[in-house]
């Protein structure tokens, strides 16, 4: 059976016409799949029963449910999925007073190898399809409460760019889930060639994982720095800034004694000079087997004051779901080593 979930309106239209159906059936199908929680094609009563039966001979909606749900003491929920290729991956729902955020994955595992991230330590298992990415949003019970999506789960979105771009098209299109592009943020380590492509045709907000402004130091914790210098990524963004309502931000995992002193703060200010952006400081989230430490509160506050003093708009992003392995850098999708 061929899954319709993960297909664009153009692709669904092609399928309908191939089966000698009327073109308008495609819009009815996409609306039911992406807006109405339809689990079977038989639910699409706006198209003739005879065509539904014909469609069911070779096609299915393609949605599937998580195989495990974990809830944190802070009400964060982590969902574990397994797709048809047996790739496991996770998404995290974080309710808040103003925003209810869903963090979704784009790969099972990751091949970027960032030293502070547990996801990278499990290695790369496989790319997710647009179907798998969109399904993380469609399949959870909090779907209608979500008003913000962050593509910051397992994997590097720019390493699976075609499927990620297609998934965001489905999420934001009027014929799809009609989720506002300005309420979706994609996080990347800054793979240069893909960053160029994204900046030519941006489709959501962008967050770049900075973590250290010095080339040699960044390379020691993020091996991709050697081929994808952060300075070049920043220059690309300066040359082609995002236009409102889309925005760019930077992320910085704070590691005690590694990247949180005045020297780093000054270099960050120099690097980001000329970009209207926000720097999100993320305290490193502990995982077994790592030598890194999260900064103390006085160390972190001093770093924030230093950044602000140099003109960098920076604040601390609160970690959620640490007790269930749902915080930034902790997600492994049931692939624990």
Give short role names for the model-derived ranges.
Residues 77, 89, 100-104, 112, ...:
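Generic beta-strand structural signal
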Residues 131, 135-143:
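Ferredoxin-type iron-sulfur electron-transfer modules in oxidoreductases and energy-metabolism complexes
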Residues 95-132:
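Canonical Radical SAM [4Fe-4S] cluster-binding loop centered on the CxxxCxxC motif
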Residues 70-72, 105-106, 187, 209:
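Short linear Ser/Thr-Pro motifs
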Residues 86-94, 98:
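P-loop NTP-binding catalytic core
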Residues 142-148, 153-317:
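Conserved AdoMet/S-adenosylmethionine-binding subsite of the radical SAM
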Residues 1-89, 238-247, 252-337:
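Auxiliary Fe-S-binding modules of radical SAM enzymes
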């Amino acid at each position: 059976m061929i899954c319709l979930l993960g297909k664009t309106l153009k692709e669904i239209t092609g399928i309908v016409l191939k089966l000698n159906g009327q073109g308008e059936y495609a819009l009815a199908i996409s609306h039911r799949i992406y807006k109405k929680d339809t689990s079977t094609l038989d639910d699409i009563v706006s198209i003739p029963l005879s065509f539904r039966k014909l469609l069911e001979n070779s096609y299915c909606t393609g949605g599937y449910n998580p195989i495990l749900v974990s809830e944190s003491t802070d009400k964060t929920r982590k969902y574990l999925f397994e797709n048809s290729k047996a790739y496991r991956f996770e998404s995290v729902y974080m309710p808040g007073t103003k925003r209810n955020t869903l963090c979704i994955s784009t790969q099972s595992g990751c091949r970027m190898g960032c030293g502070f991230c547990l996801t990278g330590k499990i290695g790369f298992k496989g790319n997710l399809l647009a179907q798998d990415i969109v399904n993380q949003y469609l399949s959870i019970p909090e779907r209608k409460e979500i008003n913000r999506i962050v593509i910051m789960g397992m994997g590097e979105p720019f390493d699976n760019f075609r499927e990620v771009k297609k998934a965001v098209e489905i999420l934001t299109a009027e014929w799809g889930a009609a989720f506002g592009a300005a309420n979706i943020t994609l996080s990347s380590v800054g793979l240069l060639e893909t960053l160029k492509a994204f900046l030519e045709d941006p489709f959501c907000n962008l967050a770049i994982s900075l973590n250290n402004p010095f080339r040699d130091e960044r390379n020691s914790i993020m091996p991709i720095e050697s081929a994808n210098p952060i300075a070049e990524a920043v220059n690309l963004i300066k040359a082609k800034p995002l236009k409102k309502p889309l925005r760019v931000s930077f992320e910085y995992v704070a590691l005690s004694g590694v990247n949180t002193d005045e020297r780093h703060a000054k270099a960050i200010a120099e690097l980001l000079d000329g970009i209207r952006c926000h720097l999100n400081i993320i305290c490193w989230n502990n995982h077994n087997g790592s030598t890194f430490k999260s900064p103390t509160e006085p160390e972190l506050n001093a770093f924030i004051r230093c950044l602000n003093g140099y003109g960098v708009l920076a604040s601390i992003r609160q970690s959620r779901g640490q007790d269930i392995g749902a915080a930034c850098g902790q997600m492994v999708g049931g692939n624990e080593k």
